[in-house]
Amino acid sequence: MKKLLTLLLAFSIMPAFADMSGNVAYTSDYMWRGQSQSLGGGAFQAGVELDYEGFFVGAWASEVDFGDDSASLEYDLYGGYNFQVSDKLSMSVGVMQYRWDDNDIEMVEEAFAHFSTRLVDFQYAVDTDNSDNDYMELRLKAPFVDVVGVEFVYGRFPDDSTWKGLNLSKSWDKVDLGLMIMEDAKDGQFSDNVSLTLAYKL
């Protein structure tokens, strides 16, 4: 938790001309691309982002648990550019680095493109060092649902392994609540793959 707070403080010294946003969160299970990154346990998370005329840079961090004495913290650095393709389609392109507080775990770098409409999000990420780690994700948003946000997620890897999930979300002024029900990419089971996340916007 102290490492997460340190990252937030580092980003607090930033140019005044950029818009800064951030959040802190707790999740009952840190799930990423169809697999738990915390062995089914809880994790504190935090993120901060700077935006200026479409350009963005940010950092995000989470506690992790891989079942050994290796990494206890993941921290991701990213940057890119958002723009409107048309009235109904927006796009962002950028680069993201995944890092861990263990020198034995190699940094992973991805280039990504993200397309978004009112009802559909599509993302493709390319691992700059290993194409076996490329990733595609499709998110379908349920229309005409005002009480909660409903989103169906489908992810696919180059080896044809896939995962599916259902996201339910509710937002208030500074609080976001999310529930994910996920099919594990390894065993294809939905059982026990449920994560509840509470986030507070800074």
Each PLM stretch: what is its role?
Residues 4, 16-202:
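Outer-membrane beta-barrel proteins
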